[in-house]
Amino acid sequence: QIKAISDSFTQQYGKALSVQSVQRSGPNNATLEVEYEKAVATIEITTEASPPFKVAGLLAKGFAVKGDSIDKIKTDFGALSGTSGFVVQKLSDDGVATLHALNADKQFATGSTFKLYVLAELASQVAGGQRRWSDVVPLGVRNHSSAGTQNWPLDTPVTLQTLATWMISVSDNASTDALMRELGRDAVEGKLATIGHSAPDKALPMLTTVEAFALKSNPTLRQRFEKASEAEQRDLLASERAALSYGAINMSQLGSGPVAIDSVEWSASPQDTALLLNSLRRTNSQTARDIMAVNSGVGPTAASKWRYLGYKGGSEPGVISMSFLPQSKAGDWYASSGSWNNPAKEVDNGVFVSL
């Protein structure tokens, strides 16, 4: 499997020429910068703990393509199969300046990017005195793709800050749904109106991750949901709780390509997400921004070029989205968000990351 990953890098970026740097991040982990003929890759590598210390994990965090330019990036974005778009903005308290954009107003499935709305609402409730980051609640939720809390007992006590950190840094789904439960779906949905969203009819009702998995894996229930009005969809979510629970998810229905990415999803345009990023910049919650910076999305070498780098991504078959909130060493703030959707086949995450 690792050879297949390495071969895919070579096929796309040419031969590996040299290892430019190695930064140790743990007893068996390191981040490497590897120069290829066409790009410089940031790669996280994990070895086994005992001799002969075989490579156990290999993760590409980003590719800096040689000779890149914004015009080339736009051309490459436009050549992607399906639909794609992005926006890059400079942010200030005096206004927002769009520097570069392509299909920035088009709605895309964005996967876990919606979790930034959950973070924004949590920060608002803490700022309003309704909650504290240190408040302790039971986990109470189980779901797939929950790297932080997988197999934890349901009565495990966790702070809201811990849940938020898992939710953003490793996209933990159980943590997300626990926060949705505590904050309230209506309150999180209210962030779309407060911050601004160009097509709330496509984004509401805002599903929990369990609901999304369950709907995607149940064709009969999904078809009912797709044909329903928003009010009817809300009634369905309330009346079909057993069918929309973790135990009802049929993962065998989710392993063969994109499923309902146009109808059972979290929808936003790059411009919508840029508004959300700017709102998180302007909030008085340093804790929320610290949480966004736990996982920079690009590795420590690329992140070190910025004073601050907040990140959230989202992906599933047929969907990838990446959003950044960077602050330059000079103090200037930016928002960058891009998405790529293809309802007919899986997208190439490596290609998108390189853009």
Per-region residue spans from a language model:
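Short solvent-exposed beta->alpha transition segments
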Residues: 1-28
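Exposed beta-sheet edge and beta->alpha loop/turn motif
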Residues: 25-71
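Second-shell loop/turn segments in exported
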Residues: 31, 63, 101-110, 148-154, ...
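Beta-lactamase-like hydrolase cores
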Residues: 61-109
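Structured C-terminal helix/loop/strand segments within mature extracytoplasmic catalytic/sensor domains
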Residues: 62-80, 251-355
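Active-site SXXK
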Residues: 109-137, 167, 336
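Short, glycine/proline-biased beta-turn/loop segments that scaffold the active-site neighborhood
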Residues: 128-156
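Active-site-adjacent helix/loop patches that line small-molecule binding or acyl-intermediate pockets
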Residues: 154-246, 271
